[in-house]
Amino acid sequence: MKEKFRCIKQEDRKKILLLCDDIRMHSGIGTMGKEIVIGTAHHFNWFNLGGAVKHPQAGKVLDMSEDVNKQANIEDSSVKVMPYNGYGDPKIVRDIIRVEKPDAILIFTDPRYWVWLFEMEREIRKSIPIFYLNIWDDYPAPLYNRPYYESCDVLLAISKQTKNINEIVLGDKAKDKIIEYLPHGINTDYYFPVKESHPDYNKFKEFKKKVLRDKEYDFIVFYNSRNIRRKSTSDSIFAYRLFCDLIGKEKAKKCAFILHTQPVDQNGTDLYAVREALCDPEYVNVYFSTDKLETAQLNLMYNIADVTMQLSSNEGWGLALTESLVTGTMIIANVTGGMQDQMRFSKDGKWIDLTPDFPSNHRGDIKEHGEWAEPVFPSNISIAGSPPTPYIFDDRCAPKDAAKALLKVYELGSEERERRGEEGRKWAIGNEAKFTAEHMTKSVIEVLDKGFDSFKPRPAYEFYKIEDLPRKVINHKLIDYSYE
């Protein structure tokens, strides 16, 4: 067993109540939650109130320690999961705190799911801190989230944009918080390149043959995400059709677009109808992968692909891009949210940071980027919203621009695509990007330890002078960005 970072005896560890998806689930949140738990089980003890819809095991407490021991290669983890319908409520959290006596709460997902928790934050923070692994898709900075951010002691920001947003929204109160960048990390034991020398190469060939139905293609585009509006799945199909027109029918016949998604979804659209309306089956090969894939199979899908495409108009991170990078596969993405991080936009070779004066690169001010990526800059930036989230930019790229990006990647040729994909993999798993589970969990330990050390319990009550509330005015640039 290799030496673990900051290994602590079980009886001396802090216990953390993790509120998120059931870590046994295959959702993005569940997967990242599981990686954090397994990668830190030698340093923290964990109790996961695991949310789901109509969970069949709701209310049971399951001891996962033995399974975690095997995966983490340790002998004394303490990991329990209590499945629950939804993400929890005040009563169940009070009960867990009373029985399990956690030293902190860590929450992970959209803040709107935690309003009930933020409303009881003083009750909780009299004794233990609240840590928040958070993300926000886009600007303008959500000033309506200020009470939520103020309710936390530590803010772990999944994207550079989110860290900037946390600091902008909190204003002067940011100095009283720990705010750190913590990008998603992929387990490189599960996602990796499968080349001819790899032991699984024969499995890969058989899987590829099955997926492609015994056909040979020169160029394969992959999409792995939900069929919901903000993912712009229909635009992706339209972009692929336009790409086929650019290269001509005969070359297009040797290309394919595979979408691993649910083709019909009430939160998205009917992709079968989109394909029928836009794609001539004679030369526009669009296929849907609808079977549930195990992680090993999904890794092979990324290895089959020449490029992974994600054109979301709002995207906090874009986990499919990260998975693609660590398998050595190039990416095409809309320049928005956390997808920008993965394209490594740079100025004079230095990876850019985001500030109030330069909150995003979605306006295309900086063109220098990692050679493993082909960015598509939004052609329209409009403001969408709803009563709970009154305003947020909707960064839509034009399908014709995405088609041109596909053409660029296609014209590179297979050897150059492979070389660039390998450069992306090296960067993603390296010490600058740190997009691996090992990097992520080490950072979790460092930041949460800092949070425990600096925690100051809130007093039972405070006196406030009643004054007019200040106007909630955006104080960062909305146009005419400047990067220094």
Regions found by a protein language model. Give the residues of each.
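Aromatic "clamp/platform" in nucleotide-sugar-dependent glycosyltransferases that forms part
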Residues: 313
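A charged, aromatic-enriched C-terminal amphipathic alpha-helix characteristic of glycosyltransferases
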Residues: 393-401, 414-446
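Carbohydrate-associated surface elements
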Residues: 161, 185
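N-terminal subdomain of nucleotide-sugar transferases
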Residues: 1-66, 70, 100, 475, ...
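Nucleotide-activated donor-binding/catalytic signature segment of Leloir-type glycosyltransferases, i.e.
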Residues: 80, 268-296
